[in-house]
Regions:
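Preference for protein termini
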Residues: 1-447
């Protein structure tokens, strides 16, 4: 719920305790309660929509909020921030030169998504991932979509994340993407849109679970007894899903979570998920391949591994096949994978499906593979490999968000209105030299 007119490139939870007073036109305690005089400024409000009254699903939450003063909200918010720091709930921003480890932002006013809205979002994400899986099965198989001109062949076969090693290699249940991070934003008009897909090694779910736990501890009187769908069983659900892709004949599979190690930006999440699933957290040096089978080194000897939930990018996964200088992967892992002796989630080669240029074709792929209309729309996207897309981007670069197509996690993104003239000039030079490597999108004015 934001009243600011500042444009944003991606949704960010409000920093704990910041700007609480500025959200409201009147001091707490005056007639009408805490939200008296609140002005949405023409933006969709997650609590009140475009009206000055609580949305049906938020009536009870707003009533409870009226029982808090600004001072009490700030006090609890600050306490929550300290607890996040104590628990180590942080993430790393490598491009931030001043502060590498950052605390997870915590908003004292929770976003409420009514059940009927959530069901539509859920259906839209399922539809999207189904199309992406069909697309991956196709491009690593008969390549019908390329032959039918649904998507340019050079965009796929020339993609840095296309893995020829996956050609004609079957995967369990035809599923390449088992865990997908779909970035969804709601604009000032109240409409949800997909900003991008993350189908390689997406992270962030641990922060959702921890945020919920902290909200329940910091504001028990705010959320107690509200009909909220649980998120604490995510680890159990993930372990069950991973068990289903174990090699044939394995009834009680050994699952491990493969991490690059403590210096990875999402290492907190790796620890969290391994603990929640009840599986070993391993690094490449903890695994070995013998006779095309994967084993884990233990004090009792070698133990067979059947499913690897990997949080390691393709390039570093197996030095025999990908980067030979990788010290993070497992030599011979792809041999075991090809033989069907171990399952990987997500599968190798999924990066081509979440490429930001391919993103622009996802609605078309949904229609092609599923014969359905997209449930959730894309954000307007300009493909710089196309002359009109390049011209549009160069002419308006200072007002657009420019993204490298093959990166993930926000790396290399240039937010036109927020960078210096020097940084914008450097980005323009890179774009002009290699337009096929970029797409652009408008700044999204968020709810």
């Amino acid at each position: 719920m934001k009243k600011t007119s500042k444009k944003r490139a991606a949704p960010k939870a409000g920093a704990a305790g910041r700007g609480l007073r500025s959200r409201f036109a009147k001091p707490a305690g005056e007639a009408g309660g805490l939200l008296s005089g609140y002005d949405t400024g023409g933006y969709w409000c997650e609590l009140q929509g475009h009206s000055h009254h609580a949305l049906p699903a938020c009536i009870e939450l707003e009533r409870r909020l009226d029982g808090f003063s600004i001072a009490e909200l700030k006090k609890r918010s600050n306490a929550a921030t300290r607890e996040f720091m104590t628990l180590g709930v942080t993430f790393t921003v490598y491009s931030n030169r001043d502060q590498i480890d950052r605390i997870l932002p915590f908003d004292v006013i929770p976003r409420v998504i009514p059940g009927v809205e959530w069901e539509r979002l859920e259906a839209g994400v399922i539809q999207r991932v189904a199309a992406m899986n069909a697309f991956l099965g196709d491009i690593y198989g008969k390549q019908r979509a390329l032959k039918d001109g649904i998507i340019p062949a050079e965009l796929v076969l020339g993609n840095a994340n296309y893995r020829k090693e996956m050609q004609d290699l079957p995967v369990p249940h035809g599923t390449y993407i088992h865990v997908c991070g779909t970035d969804i934003v709601r604009g000032k008009d109240g409409k949800f849109r997909v900003l991008e897909d993350n189908g390689r090694t997406p992270s962030g779910v641990s922060y959702v679970v921890e945020n919920r736990h902290l909200m329940q501890r910091a504001f028990p009187d705010l959320v107690h007894d509200l009909p909220i769908r649980p998120v604490s069983n995510y680890g159990q659900k993930l372990a069950e899903a991973l068990s289903q892709i174990a090699p044939a004949g394995v009834d009680d599979p050994q699952i491990v979570l493969l991490s690059p190690g403590a210096y990875n930006s999402a290492y907190f999440e790796h620890i969290f998920l391994a603990r929640e699933m009840g599986v070993p957290l391993v690094e490449g040096r903890d695994l070995t391949v013998e006779k095309d089978r994967v084993f884990m080194k233990t004090v009792g000897g070698l133990a067979p591994v059947h499913v690897i939930y990997r949080r390691l990018n393709d390039d570093f996964l197996d030095p025999e096949v990908f980067r030979p200088d990788s010290m993070l992967g497992v030599p011979g892992l792809m041999r075991a994978y090809r033989k069907g002796n171990v399952a990987l989630a997500n599968a190798v080669g999924t990066g081509v499906a979440d490429d930001k240029a391919v993103y622009a074709y996802i609605p078309r792929l949904i229609r092609y593979y599923l014969s359905e209309e997209p449930i959730i729309d894309n954000v307007e996207t300009h493909i710089c490999r196309e002359p009109e897309g390049l011209k549009f981007t160069l002419d308006r670069m200072e007002s657009l968000v420019v993204k490298p197509v093959g990166e993930s996690g926000g790396y290399g993104v240039v937010i036109g209105p927020r960078v210096s003239k020097r940084e914008l000039a450097e980005a323009r030079e890179l774009l002009t030299a290699n337009p096929a490597n970029y797409i652009s999108q408008p700044m999204i004015e968020l709810s």
